[in-house]
Swiss-Prot record:
Record has Secreted as a keyword: no
InterPro entries registered for this protein in UniProt: Ribosomal_uL6-like (IPR000702), Ribosomal_uL6-like_a/b-dom_sf (IPR036789), Ribosomal_uL6_a/b-dom (IPR020040), Ribosomal_uL6_bac-type (IPR019906), Ribosomal_uL6_CS (IPR002358)
GO BP of this protein: cytoplasmic translation
Organism annotation: Vibrio campbellii (strain ATCC BAA-1116)
Protein name: Large ribosomal subunit protein uL6
Function: This protein binds to the 23S rRNA, and is important in its secondary structure. It is located near the subunit interface in the base of the L7/L12 stalk, and near the tRNA binding site of the peptidyltransferase center.
Subunit-level organization: Part of the 50S ribosomal subunit.
Any one GO CC term of the record: cytosolic large ribosomal subunit
Coiled-coil regions listed: none
Gene encoding the protein: rplF
Gene Ontology MF annotations: rRNA binding; structural constituent of ribosome
PANTHER family recorded: 60S/50S RIBOSOMAL PROTEIN L6/L9, LARGE RIBOSOMAL SUBUNIT PROTEIN UL6M
Keywords on record: Ribonucleoprotein, Ribosomal protein, RNA-binding, rRNA-binding
Residues making up the signal peptide according to the UniProt record: none
Length: 177
């Protein structure tokens, strides 16, 4: 039985929630998000709270209800506060710059890398070695950050590459003669 599903999701002022069967739409100051939830989940809206529960007879209904509650809570937080991921570039000549709706990266390849940003995602570069990605969809913000990081992951000997700001890269010792 999911303990996560038992806690209701509070709907703050300024956030509008629409239920249409299993489709839920959350609209707030930072944007609008829509998601279709699993059929094994029952959603009920009571004043300023959303409650989740299992549908009778479904095998993994409590697990699905907990997942649905976490996803909807992230939607509510996203449209009110938004989500942020910070990336740092470490390495000689590694640079980042915003070019329209894309992030231009110089990562030691023979060519510059252009990463196109999807709709609803914003990026900024406070310095040449920092990228801050913001948006209201937690999954999409994390995916864009992971895609940018995948161009040049931190290598284990010197730690050069693109890393999350809070990431701790374990370095190996070089081979001795």
């Amino acid at each position: 039985m999911s303990r996560v599903a038992k806690a209701p999701v509070a709907i703050p002022a300024g956030v509008e929630v629409k239920l249409n069967g299993q489709e839920i739409t959350v609209k707030g100051a930072k944007g609008e998000l829509t998601r279709v939830l699993n059929d094994a989940v029952v959603i009920a809206q009571e004043e300023n709270n959303l409650t989740f529960g299992p549908k009778e007879g479904a095998a993994n209904a409590w697990a699905q209800a907990g997942t649905a509650r976490a996803l909807v809570n992230n939607m509510v937080v996203g449209v009110t506060e938004g989500f942020t991921k910070k990336l740092t570039l470490k390495g000689v000549g590694y640079r980042a710059a915003i070019k329209g709706n894309a992030v231009g990266l110089t990562l030691g390849f023979s060519h510059p890398v252009e990463h196109e940003l999807p709709a609803g995602i914003k990026a900024e570069c406070p310095s040449q070695t920092e990228i801050i990605i913001t948006g209201c969809d937690k999954q999409l913000v994390g995916q864009v950050a992971a895609d940018i990081r995948s161009y040049r992951q931190p290598e284990p000997y010197k730690g050069k590459g693109v890393r999350y700001a809070d990431e701790n890269v374990r370095t190996k010792e070089a081979k001795k003669k």
